[in-house]
């Protein structure tokens, strides 16, 4: 079983983190450890490779960064758990689809830990609430880049955020899509206590643990030439 290191980077400027991901991936060797970075960003909009700038409806004073992941526009900000997956997919024997499935399953498992029901939607990557007054609202977004069989970028899970910046965009390219966080969804821990922004570290490590479990479950389930994009 190939280990995965968990690195908590805390609060970090998006551009600095993006540059670090690219450098890490470019400098990888056959023995470079697989790593998940846990990060929280200051407010920033990011636009994917094929993203349409028209989905930024009202930029205001939040910067826009064009990046090399897939997908459209999204928002990162305080109170959001971001997990970047820097993995050698060939070494792990993972297809990209299996990686996406693992990420989405890990988010669903994390939310279930906090008594929030969620689900995938066909053709719309990310995780959505499956019950309650905000059923259908998006609570997590994902976007990936595969280079030489190695992944970077990852997934963002909304914990306790100022959600108003999401109204300034068409989230992931979908006009009018409601976006919520775990607080809005009524997330509670095993003792019944409502989660809040102070739970960032705890929630981030639950997500990391679920990501590792899902990735290890899928390891070597696919041929080693899987990730070639």
Swiss-Prot record:
Subcellular location: Cytoplasm
Reaction equations catalysed: octanoyl-[ACP] + L-lysyl-[protein] = N(6)-octanoyl-L-lysyl-[protein] + holo-[ACP] + H(+)
Pathway assignment: Protein modification; protein lipoylation via endogenous pathway; protein N(6)-(lipoyl)lysine from octanoyl-[acyl-carrier-protein]: step 1/2
Record's protein name: Octanoyltransferase
Entry binding sites for substrate: 69-76, 141-143, 154-156
Gene3D superfamilies: Bira Bifunctional Protein, Domain 2 (3.30.930.10)
Alphabetically ordered keywords of this record: Acyltransferase, Cytoplasm, Transferase
HAMAP family: LipB
Family per similarity comment: Belongs to the LipB family.
GO CC terms of this entry: cytoplasm
CDD domains: LipB
One GO-annotated biological process of the protein: protein modification process
InterPro entries, sorted: aa-tRNA-synth_II/BPL/LPL, BPL_LPL_catalytic, Octanoyltransferase, Octanoyltransferase_CS
Gene (name only): lipB
């Amino acid at each position: 079983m190939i280990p995965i290191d968990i690195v908590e980077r805390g609060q970090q400027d998006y551009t600095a983190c993006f540059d670090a991901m690219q450098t890490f991936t470019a400098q990888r060797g056959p023995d470079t450890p697989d790593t998940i970075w846990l990060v929280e960003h200051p407010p920033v909009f990011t636009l994917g490779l094929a993203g349409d700038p028209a989905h930024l409806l009202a930029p205001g004073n939040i910067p826009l960064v064009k990046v090399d992941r897939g997908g459209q526009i999204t928002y990162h900000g305080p109170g959001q758990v971001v997990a970047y997956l820097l993995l050698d997919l060939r070494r792990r024997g993972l297809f990209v689809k299996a990686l996406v499935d693992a990420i989405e399953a890990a988010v669903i498992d994390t939310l279930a830990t906090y008594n929030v029901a969620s689900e995938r939607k066909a053709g719309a990557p990310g995780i959505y609430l499956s019950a309650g007054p905000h059923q259908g609202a998006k609570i997590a977004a994902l976007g990936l880049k595969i280079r030489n069989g190695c992944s970077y970028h990852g997934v963002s899970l909304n914990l306790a955020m100022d959600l108003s910046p999401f109204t300034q965009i068409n989230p992931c390219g979908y006009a009018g899509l409601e976006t919520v966080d775990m607080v809005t969804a009524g997330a509670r821990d095993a003792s019944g206590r409502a989660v809040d922004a102070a739970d960032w570290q705890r929630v981030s490590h639950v997500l990391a643990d679920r990501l590792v479990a899902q990735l290890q479950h899928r390891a070597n389930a696919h041929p080693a030439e899987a990730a070639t994009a």
